[in-house]
Amino acid sequence: MDILQKIMQQKAQEVAIRRGQVSEAALLQRVKYAPPTQGFAHALLSRAQQGQNGVIAEVKRGSPSKGRIYPEHLAWQPAQIAESYRANGAACISCLTDETFFMGHDAFLQAIRAAVACPVLRKDFLYHSYQVVEARSLGADAILLIMAVLETPQAQELEAAARELGMDVLVEVHDERELEQAHELKTPLMGVNNRNLKTFVTDIETSFRLAARMEKGRLAISESGLNTPEDLARLNEAGIFSFLIGESLMRGGEPGGALAQLLGREVV
């Protein structure tokens, strides 16, 4: 069993427990009190149309492949990290909510959404409509759909549920088959994960290959393995101006400063 299968097995157990604690109908009631959605897709599309880099900066404490990423001796303050990202040029924020494998938590997303005027993505492994409603109740402006764990009809149902709640959808692919499936969705946001989620091997060439095969009107978003301004410049040459970056920003303990350096900006 690879790591992705383990994660999805855990998610099935997690969702079953949560549905037993709070019904989907009760969650929908909570949605009424959630802050209104901010334009996640618009924040990225508007920058890309102007030839400007749009970064989804990720609040990421750890991962299955790297263990703890954010330095252990520093206080963990997700809202402050997200605000530092915003101040240093992030277009959007991504927040991991998976506890078991990525050291995330729903409360991190809630804290970020309450404190930061920036669209927020719930980064998790979604497969059930319950998780979509849950994302909106937490204040998410967008959700991630990973085609490696979803069949096309399932992804379409989740996308429709998200849109009904006013959220945008970022669909993530890693190969040609997944891209073909993703083209069946309506969202313009196409994330290309340079990291193979089954082996965790990273190759930035994946972004070049798949972006070239995308339908017109889709926005390629390069994810994982982006470490230097040169990486971004190479992708810019191929017409890619949108990125999801986390690990390389979090590792040094000053995520906002690391983002500013990556974007060639003055650190705020």
From Swiss-Prot:
Root EC class: lyase
Catalysis: reaction(s): 1-(2-carboxyphenylamino)-1-deoxy-D-ribulose 5-phosphate + H(+) = (1S,2R)-1-C-(indol-3-yl)glycerol 3-phosphate + CO2 + H2O
Keyword presence, Lyase: yes
GO molecular function, one term: indole-3-glycerol-phosphate synthase activity
Family annotation (Gene3D superfamilies): Aldolase class I
Enzyme Commission identifier(s): 4.1.1.48
GO biological processes: L-tryptophan biosynthetic process
Keyword Amino-acid biosynthesis listed: yes
Highest taxon of source: Bacteria
Pathway, per record: Amino-acid biosynthesis; L-tryptophan biosynthesis; L-tryptophan from chorismate: step 4/5
Record key words, sorted: Amino-acid biosynthesis, Aromatic amino acid biosynthesis, Decarboxylase, Lyase, Tryptophan biosynthesis
HAMAP family the UniProt entry points to: IGPS_B
Listed PANTHER family: INDOLE-3-GLYCEROL-PHOSPHATE SYNTHASE, TRYPTOPHAN BIOSYNTHESIS PROTEIN
Listed NCBIfam families: PRK00278.1-6 (NF001373), PRK00278.2-4 (NF001377)
Family from the record: Belongs to the TrpC family.
Protein name per Swiss-Prot or TrEMBL: Indole-3-glycerol phosphate synthase
Phylogenetic placement of the source organism: Bacteria, Pseudomonadati, Pseudomonadota, Alphaproteobacteria, Magnetococcales
